[in-house]
Amino acid sequence: MFNWVKTAMLMAGITALFIVIGGMIGGTRGMTIALLFALAMNFFSYWFSDKMVLRMYNAQEVDENTAPQFYRMVRELATRANLPMPRVYLINEDAPNAFATGRNPEHAAVAATTGILRVLSEREMRGVMAHELAHVKHRDILISTITATMAGAISALANFAMFFGGRDENGRPANPIAGIAVALLAPIAGALIQMAISRAREFEADRGGAQISGDPQSLATALDKIHRYAAGIPFQAAEAHPATAQMMIMNPLHGGGLQNLFSTHPATEERIARLMEMARTGRFD
């Protein structure tokens, strides 16, 4: 429940930030235009992002004939989660990782790298795919699409304000110093909120995945393995498309500096600790 409340508050925050910047550029009209612009971008992302992401990673759809064990695992977990069967994809990459995409549970897809199938045991793989199906069940793909779109739009509007200035409610030019401050600080604030939402949704997917599989310990050991192996194996497709990093079960990017604030994922140690506590107590709340 805490993660859902936190997500709602952060979503409200990023929406407010977006509208305020629109207002600084052009008063009420600016806010209206900004909101309509965000809605248009969200609509496009909502309907087409899954196809774009799968194409970026050259993901190949599989079925019960081409990947029988993996496909049956996903089907069994989808049944346990009371979800429609998603499309199942494999990505020919050594880096161990997985993600879910799709605009809703009826149009969902899950994908895993060939590397993760080699690294994890069957029980651990069940934990990972249960985590991805929890994202589908919680409609996190929609949430991440909205936040990523709005964070990008905030940056674009802030740059517009810096280079072209803004207008107040009466049409007078806005304070240029305020415009520069907005251009510098608003994109950072938007990114911070976006990352915080992503981390909250990862915690919630860990909890939901543990409920679906009934085995939080296996997800914990899977995260530990993925973290250790991924550190030494570059994920080239993810490095080429860093905006998709938040979709993965483990952050595939290798960067430093202010990592906790700008990371799309919580610290692996904290995720493991929470899952082990679930395993110890048998409670998933």
UniProtKB/Swiss-Prot annotation:
Membrane topology field: Multi-pass membrane protein
Matches recorded under InterPro entries: HtpX_protease (IPR050083), Pept_M48_protease_HtpX (IPR022919), Peptidase_M48 (IPR001915)
One cellular component (GO) term of this entry: plasma membrane
Cofactor: Zn(2+)
Catalytic residues in the record: E132
Co-factor note (free text): Binds 1 zinc ion per subunit.
One of the record's GO molecular function terms: metalloendopeptidase activity
Protein biosynthesis is among the record's keywords: no
Transmembrane domains' residue ranges: 7-27, 30-50, 146-166, 177-197
GO annotation, biological process: proteolysis
Positions annotated to bind Zn(2+): H131, H135, E202
Keywords annotated in UniProt: Cell inner membrane, Cell membrane, Hydrolase, Membrane, Metal-binding, Metalloprotease, Protease, Transmembrane, Transmembrane helix, Zinc
Classification via HAMAP family: Pept_M48_protease_HtpX (MF_00188)
Protein name as catalogued: Protease HtpX homolog
Source organism (scientific name): Burkholderia ambifaria (strain MC40-6)
